[in-house]
Structure formats: C-alpha cells, structure tokens
Amino acid sequence: MEAALLNIVQKINGYLSDYILIVLLIGAGLYFSIRTRFVQVRCFGEGMRRVFGNINLHGGKQQGGFSSFQALATAIAAQVGTGNIVGACGAILIGGPGAIFWMWIIAFFGMATIYAEAVLAQETRVVNADGSVHGGPVYYIKRAFKGGFGKFLAGFFAVAIILALGFIGSMVQSNSIGEALSNATGVPTWVIGIVVAALSAYVFLGGSHRVAAWAEKIVPVMACLYLIGGLVVLLARIRFIPETFGMIFRYAFQPQSIIGGSFGFALKQAISQGVKRGLFSNEAGMGSTPHAHAMAKVSCPHEQGVVAMIGVFIDTFVVLTMTALVVISTLYAGNGILASGAAEGVSKTNMAQLAFSSIMGNTAGSLFVAICLMFFAFSTILGWNFFGRINVEYLFGKKAVPVYSIIAVELIFLGSCVSNDLAWELSDMFNQLMVIPNFLAIVALGGLVAAAARKGSRETLKK
C-alpha cells in the first residue's frame, strides 16, 4: 500500500515540478522584474544598506511585531536549510555543474518575486487591538479574490502549508539532523530526537518572539560557520577556482560531458535541476517567507521588500554557491575524484561530506557537515513551524496553537528516528501545491506591487 502511494505521489511531484511550477515561478519572476523595473538591480544597494548598515533594523520593534532584521532572520532561517547542502549536491550530481548557473538565474528573478510577496504581506497585514500582528498569503489571497473563491484559495493554502512545513516538513528536517549527527558521532538517533524535540518545544512555547529571537542569533552563526569552513576548502583548492567557474558556465549549455546521454536530455537535466533546486532553496514565490516579512515594522512596504530580496541573495548567491564551489572544486575540477564523470557510490547525501573530507580529513569533514546540517535543519524547523502556526490561527483560532505545537514536536521526534521516503515526497507535494494560490494572488495584485516600487523609489531618492 505504501509503495503504491509513494509511486502516485512521486508521479504527481514530477508533473508539478517539471511543468507547472517551473512555468509559474519563472513567469512570476519575469513578470515582477518588468513591473518593478528590475527592482532587484535598482534597489539591491538599498537592500544591502537596510540589512547591514541601518541600525534601526535591530530596534524599533513594535508590540506584537518584529524588527526588520528579525523578520529577515526568521525568513532566512526557513530558506537556508538542508537544501543548501543536500539540494545543491543533488542538482550537481544529476544535472552537472551547469545546474548551478540555472540556480543563479532563477534566484535573480526570484528576488523580484519575493519583493512582491513581502510588499503584499505588508500591505495586507492585520494589527489587532492588543498589538499582535498577523499577515501572510492567506490575507493577500483574500484581497485578490473576493467572496467564496478567495476564502477557498486561502483555506487551501493554509492547509497545504500546515502539512508541508509545520508537520511533514519539520519531520523530514529532523530526520536530516538525526541521520547526520548519528553517522558522525555514533549517538543513537532517538537520543538526538529527544534533544531536538525538547529544544523545539522550548522555542515553540515562547511564541513568535522567541522564534525571532533565536533566529536572529542562529542565522548569523550558522552562516558564518559554514562560509568559514567553505573558504578553508576553497583556499586549499584555489588553483582550481577558475576551472570551477568555467565548468559552471560551460556545462550550463554543454552538460553531456558530465552526465552522459544525449545532448538534449543532458541540457534538460541541467536546466531542470537548477531551476527546481533553486526554487525550493530560496522559496521565492512559494508563499512561506511573507509570514515573517509581514511582522516587520517599517515605514513603507517597499522597505521590507528590498530587505526580503537580500534573503534570496544570501540563500542562493552566498550559501548555496559556497556548497557548489566546494563540491565542484574538490570532486570535479582538476584531479577531483569525479572528474571523469564516474559517480558510482556517491549520493547527494554524502557528496558534501566527501568534498569537505577531502581537505579536512574524514573525521573533521564528516563532523563539520553534520554540525552545519544540524544548524540549517533546526533553523528551518523553527521558521517553518512559525509559518504553520500563523495559518493554524487563521483556520482554527489561537486555542488550536498548543495542539498544533504538540503534534509538531511529536513528529519532530519521530522524524529523527525513522526515515520515510513517503514523508519526503508528501512534503514536496504539499510544498508545491502552496505555490498555485500564492502565484494567482501575487499576479492579480501586481499593480499594487508596481505602485509600491514606484513610491518606495521616490521616497529613497528624497532621503
């Protein structure tokens, strides 16, 4: 029964990811790039200043809301997950080094999409009498589509995100933690599961502010740790860096030398893997991160929109690219063990471990990857649970949140102990189903986004 269901879900996922999602999300990226006059280029510097150079990002939090930096940290906590390590490796393994080029392309256009999502989340958020803030796709979906159709789409999105991220998604993330740490240290997965579940429960019980507080501490630490480790490897392989970039660009259009097969099939794999992994890594257009950006206290929606763009930049152009450079420079370039294209015995789960271990040594490399996976997966659990929580409140009210949190904690423990392919596939399916109502809403409200971009640009010029 499970095998039959797994087969059905895999076929659904294949159809959704290869046809519907690629068209919708690339289309959204192109559409909003044009409507905002390529805001990801024009306002990139402004976004960087607001994240790294504007001191009021770390203060000015309103009651019930987040500072702009906390909102970004919470979004990045969800964006930067195991996909930045395992997902990048999978794309390279199947699509060749050229897949990374297509990841960059999709991230570039995704920056415009996530700008739109953040702007709409700010425009439609609700501030209650007690100061608490609620916002996210369910609110701008109802703004875009009035009446019963809008309520149906909002409800559909809410159910999908609760299942995809709050429940099944957290389960598969904890599985990554349990497997990685157990393999590196020998500690039983059930022991690791207890610790992860207990830490998760502590953060969940503290509400949205505790999630944001942990996110703004964990995200900088985990990003710096991973980047420092990656730089160590790249310095050791520095003479192969030009070749590494050359392979990324060359095999983006001529990938058959890496993975074999016909030219057409190889090119399709390179593009398909780059696009899919890129979309799922930075989450632009999926409707997850707007929940965090809605919470920020800013002067106008445009301000949080440009901050949101930097989240995609950090996720793809910094963290995911570091994984790609480490893997390609050690395993493919020069005398790399996969230079000949033979990938027997290598999987996406051990590819990063193999790459780091080639420079750091087996023990240190395995432990480093395990620790980074732990940080990435745990931060994703926190972000995803928060996104699910908002939709639970939307559907069932605040009284349902404790029940939601208890179920989530139980699944986190279970996920760390039991590996289930069906759980991974179901998570992917509901994740992809989230995109459809979110896409329809953001495109329907494209005029609102364009107006916010124009107004924000004028205000920036005045300052």
What are these regions (language model features)?
Residues F38-F66, G90, G96-P97, A112-G148, ...:
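Flexible loop linkers connecting adjacent transmembrane helices
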Residues A116-A129, L231-M247, P255, I259-F265, ...:
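Extracellular/periplasmic helix-exit of transmembrane alpha-helices
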Residues F109-E117, I194-S208, V219-R239, S272, ...:
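Selective recognition of specific alpha-helical transmembrane segments in multi-pass small-molecule
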Residues L24-Y31, R35-M48, F157, S174-L181, ...:
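Membrane-interface loop-to-helix entry segments
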Residues M1-T82, I92-A99, G110, F413, ...:
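N-terminal alpha-helical transmembrane segments of multi-pass membrane transport
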Residues G59-L93, L120-E123, A129-V138, K142-A144, ...:
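Alpha-helical membrane segments and immediately flanking helix-loop junctions
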Residues F32-S33, I106-G131, V138, K142-N175, ...:
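Helix-loop-helix module between adjacent transmembrane segments
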Residues A4-L5, R35-Q40, G83-A88, G166-G178, ...:
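Transmembrane helix-loop junctions in multi-pass membrane proteins
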